């Protein structure tokens, strides 16, 4: 199936590893991504805080371009881009607003192509069951993960129309399909501080620190997310969160596509693990250690049962 792919600006810069791992995973799973030709910025956070009409026009331009493509949907990995694209479609349901938006565009947007996140496509169009069937050896067994969705992936629910906006589980199920253990993370939709990382680093340090502290306390080896800004605040700014908390955090923060790529044994250079600030080796080593311990326990149990059977046989 063909999808119009909107990578977003961060995918070309600060989160290039998210883009490359997304493309690699989709290719491996038979999802055909067609880049929207001449795509442009959706406006991100600044546009909609200044002018809703401008914000919708910026997003609608990309939707109009996608309408000329033979695709099932427009998909994007970035929750911020997703919000702007879906909000534009939602607002343009009002005819008067739609006319105003299209007056700003060379090509009017007709709202004929649905918009989804890449996560939604993997969760619904492919499904965790199909992923599990592809990987019967459960390659991420032993890895404990805290799935973090952030505050906009599923909100507002009437616009996003995907998963539960208070307790989403799409990423949880995909990680479990890979064999990972998902810890019961109660802060999965709490804010990490978002773009306050520029103006108020103290707020980001406090909010991100709370997330990291909770994940660590639950025994997670790593956090897994679907949002470039969340990943940046939890990973790149982890040192600032540590300083604010008076405790050194050492939790790798993966994109979920990187972990799916690892499970699929895709080439390392396509996953961009080297771009993570907190070394992923910390989590992967913990995973291997936990797996070895489970194997040792199983072997000891089998040995004890064999000894018990031998003892019974001798007694008889």
Located regions from the model:
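Iron-sulfur cluster-binding electron-transfer modules in prokaryotic oxidoreductases
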Residues: 1-316
